C-alpha cells in the first residue's frame, strides 16, 4: 500500500512539472511571436489589444509620429522584401487564376472552408483572364488606398491620382469624395458581400443600374473578386458575372488563386507578425511589392480616434461600425498597421495618415 501511494505521489509531481513547463513554453512562444525581425525591431506590446486610447495617447511620442511624411524610399530594402515574398508567392501568377486553370463544371473546395465546394459556372469561366492581368507589369510608384475615415479632409486626392498605378479596396465610391481620395482606379477589389451592403443585393432594377454604372466608370481596370474564399457569396458572384457579361462592361475581371491567402499569411507569420487572416489592405500591399518600386499607403487607420482624439469613421463613405480589437474579428488590423508603420520608418513604403502636402 505504501509503495502504491509513493507511485501516485511521484506521478502527481511529474504531471505538475509537465503542466508548469508547458505553460512556461507557451508563454515563451507568445513572447517570441510578438517580435518583428530585422532592423527597427518592434515589440508588439499587450497594450495593442487592450485599448486603442492607450495606443493613441502613446502615439504622439512613439509609433505614429513619422506617419504623415516619410523620408526616402530605401530601394535595397524594397528589393529585399520583394525577394523574400517571392519565396512564398508570385503576385504576377497568384493574383488570379486563368482560363486554363479550370473548365466549366469543375468542382473546387473553398479556400477557407474545405468541406464546402463550388462549381465553376460557364459565366465564371468565360470571365477568367487568358493570362494574368499583372503579367509583365511594372510601375515606378503605386498607391494602395484603404477605406478608413482618416481620409476625410485629407486633401490627398490629387496626390493619390498622381501615382502610376492605384489600387483601391471593396469598390469604394470615389466621385463624391474625389478631393480626399482621388478617382483613378487601376485595380480594385470587391468582396462578394459588397453586393448586399452597397447595392441592396440587386433586389430591384435601380440597384442593378447603380452597380453597372459604378463598374462602367472602371473602364479597363482590373476588378479583383475573391470568389473562392468562403461559401455564402457564390450567388452574388454569379449575379456580378452575369451583369458584366450582359452589359458588355470593359472591366477586366480577376479571381485570386486558391493558394494566395495562405501564402500571404505564411510570409507574415514567418516574419513573426502573428496575423489571423490578412486584411484586404495588407493583402494588396503584399501583392504590390511584386510590381511597384515605391508603394504609398493611404486610408490605413484601424482606430476609432485620430491623434487629436477626434472620432474617425471605419469607412470614409458609410457609417458601418467595426470592433478593431475584438477577438472575433478575422483580422488583426491594429497589429497590421503597427507592422506597416515599422516598414514606413525603415523606408520600405510610405504611409500617410494625415493631410497631404500640396505640391
UniProtKB/Swiss-Prot annotation:
Q: How does it sit in the membrane?
A: Single-pass type II membrane protein
* Glycosylated sites: 50, 74, 119, 204, 219
Post-translational note:
Autopolysialylated.
Cytoplasmic compartment segments: 1-7
Judged by the first EC level, this protein's enzyme class is transferase
Known EC number(s)?
A: 2.4.99.-
Listed binding positions for CMP-N-acetyl-beta-neuraminate are 147, 170, 279-281, 301
> Which segments sit on the Lumenal face?
21-359
Pfam families documented for this protein: Glyco_transf_29
Q: What does the UniProt keyword field contain? A: Disulfide bond, Glycoprotein, Glycosyltransferase, Golgi apparatus, Membrane, Secreted, Signal-anchor, Transferase, Transmembrane, Transmembrane helix
Gene3D superfamilies, per this entry? Glycosyl transferase family 29 (3.90.1480.20)
Kindly list the places in or outside the cell where this protein is found, as annotated in its UniProt entry.
Golgi apparatus membrane; Secreted
Top-level taxon in the UniProt lineage: Eukaryota
- Could you tell me the Gene Ontology terms of the biological process aspect for this record? N-glycan processing; oligosaccharide metabolic process; protein glycosylation; sialylation
Report the transmembrane regions from the record: 8-20
Q: List the disulfide bonds.
A: 142-292, 156-356
This enzyme catalyses:
[N-acetyl-alpha-D-neuraminosyl-(2->8)](n) + CMP-N-acetyl-beta-neuraminate = [N-acetyl-alpha-D-neuraminosyl-(2->8)](n+1) + CMP + H(+)
Q: Which residues form the active site?
A: 331 (proton donor/acceptor)
Single GO cellular component term? extracellular region
Task performed by this protein:
Catalyzes the transfer of a sialic acid from a CMP-linked sialic acid donor onto a terminal alpha-2,3-, alpha-2,6-, or alpha-2,8-linked sialic acid of an N-linked glycan protein acceptor through alpha-2,8-linkages. Therefore, participates in polysialic acid synthesis on various sialylated N-acetyllactosaminyl oligosaccharides, including NCAM1 N-glycans, FETUB N-glycans and AHSG. It is noteworthy that alpha-2,3-linked sialic acid is apparently a better acceptor than alpha-2,6-linked sialic acid.
Which named protein is this? CMP-N-acetylneuraminate-poly-alpha-2,8-sialyltransferase
Which organism encodes this protein?
Bos taurus (Bovine)
Amino acid at each position: 500500500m505504501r509503495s502504491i501511494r509513493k507511485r501516485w505521489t511521484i506521478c502527481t509531481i511529474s504531471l505538475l512539472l509537465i503542466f508548469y513547463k508547458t505553460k512556461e513554453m507557451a508563454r515563451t512562444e507568445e513572447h517570441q511571436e510578438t517580435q518583428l525581425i530585422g532592423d527597427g525591431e518592434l515589440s508588439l506590446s499587450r497594450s495593442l489589444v487592450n485599448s486603442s486610447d492607450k495606443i493613441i495617447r502613446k502615439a504622439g511620442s512613439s509609433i505614429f509620429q513619422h506617419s504623415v511624411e516619410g523620408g526616402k524610399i530605401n530601394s535595397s530594402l524594397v528589393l529585399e522584401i520583394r525577394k523574400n515574398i517571392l519565396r512564398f508567392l508570385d503576385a504576377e501568377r497568384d493574383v488570379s487564376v486563368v482560363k486554363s486553370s479550370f473548365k466549366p463544371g469543375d468542382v473546387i473546395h473553398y479556400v477557407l472552408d474545405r468541406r464546402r465546394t463550388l462549381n465553376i459556372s460557364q459565366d465564371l469561366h468565360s470571365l477568367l483572364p487568358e493570362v494574368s492581368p499583372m503579367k509583365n507589369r511594372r510601375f515606378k510608384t503605386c498607391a494602395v488606398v484603404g477605406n478608413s475615415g482618416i481620409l476625410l479632409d485629407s486633401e490627398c486626392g490629387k496626390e493619390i491620382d498622381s501615382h502610376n498605378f492605384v489600387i483601391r479596396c471593396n469598390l469604394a465610391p470615389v466621385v463624391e469624395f474625389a478631393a480626399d481620395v482621388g478617382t483613378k482606379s487601376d485595380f480594385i477589389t470587391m468582396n462578394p458581400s459588397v453586393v448586399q451592403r452597397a447595392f441592396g443585393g440587386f433586389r430591384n432594377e435601380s440597384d442593378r443600374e447603380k452597380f453597372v454604372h459604378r463598374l462602367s466608370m472602371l473602364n479597363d481596370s482590373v476588378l479583383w473578386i475573391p470568389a473562392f474564399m468562403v461559401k455564402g457569396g457564390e450567388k452574388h458572384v454569379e449575379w456580378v458575372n452575369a451583369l458584366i457579361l450582359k452589359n458588355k462592361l470593359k472591366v477586366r475581371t480577376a479571381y485570386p488563386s486558391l493558394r494566395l491567402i495562405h501564402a500571404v499569411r505564411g510570409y507574415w507569420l514567418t516574419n513573426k507578425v502573428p496575423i489571423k487572416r490578412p486584411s484586404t489592405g495588407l493583402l494588396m500591399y503584399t501583392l504590390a511589392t511584386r510590381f511597384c518600386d515605391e508603394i504609398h499607403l493611404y486610408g490605413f487607420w484601424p482606430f476609432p480616434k485620430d491623434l487629436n482624439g477626434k472620432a474617425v469613421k471605419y469607412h470614409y463613405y458609410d457609417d458601418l461600425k467595426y470592433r478593431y480589437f475584438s477577438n472575433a474579428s478575422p483580422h488583426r488590423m491594429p497589429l497590421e498597421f503597427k507592422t506597416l508603420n515599422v516598414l514606413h520608418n525603415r523606408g520600405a513604403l510610405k504611409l500617410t495618415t494625415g493631410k497631404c502636402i500640396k505640391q
